[in-house]
């Protein structure tokens, strides 16, 4: 702070915990309190941003209420739920979170991700990233129910994207999934970490 820091982001886990266990919101609150005391004495304001275990919009609001932090940084939660920022902003403003995007909109997010990778990096890198990320994206796909009321899953889609050689292969797989194909297998559920 004394060296000119304008904000502090704190992840409420130790290095040893990595991604396991539950974020320590009490620890974040203690940092918020200590920074606040220091700043009041120095006559300036340095906001503390809390991070960890923000997977749903309500988690962001709970983080702010529990810790007193000025804002929330969202990390891994956004990998499977890219619209989490939109939802969290609504909930923090006291509004209801918007409905989850429809399947076509979710697939368009994957297409945009791939498009941005291609725009800013080369095709090899983009294809490596989309093959890695499809499992994260897949956690929110395939939530439609079959005739028995069970989630249909998207394992065949994930497998097809992982085997894709070119962007056109990814787009073809997404098109087929949207049309009702590449369904089945177990739904991937987000591990509680």
Give the label of every model feature segment.
Residues 1-7, 19, 26, 30-50, ...:
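Alpha/beta catalytic cores of nucleotide-metabolism and tRNA/nucleoside-modifying enzymes
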Residues 10-20:
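Glycine-rich, proline-tolerant flexible connector loops at the mouths of alpha/beta enzymes
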């Amino acid at each position: 702070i004394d060296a000119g820091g304008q904000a502090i982001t704190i992840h409420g886990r130790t290095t040893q915990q990595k991604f396991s266990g539950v974020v320590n919101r009490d620890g974040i609150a203690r940092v918020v309190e200590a920074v606040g005391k220091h700043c009041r004495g120095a006559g300036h304001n340095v906001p503390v941003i809390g991070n960890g275990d923000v997977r749903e919009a309500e988690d962001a609001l709970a983080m702010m209420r529990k810790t007193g932090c000025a804002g929330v940084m969202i990390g891994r939660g956004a990998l499977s739920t890219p619209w989490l920022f939109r939802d969290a902003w609504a909930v923090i403003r006291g509004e209801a979170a918007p409905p989850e995007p429809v399947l076509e909109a979710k697939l368009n997010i994957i297409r945009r991700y791939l498009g941005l990778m291609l725009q800013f990096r080369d095709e090899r890198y983009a294809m490596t990233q989309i093959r890695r990320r499809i499992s994260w994206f897949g956690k929110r796909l395939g939530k439609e129910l079959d005739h028995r009321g069970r989630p249909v899953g998207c394992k065949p889609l994930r497998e097809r994207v992982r085997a894709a050689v070119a962007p056109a292969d990814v787009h073809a797989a997404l098109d087929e999934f949207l049309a009702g194909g590449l369904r089945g297998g177990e739904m991937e559920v987000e591990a509680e970490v």
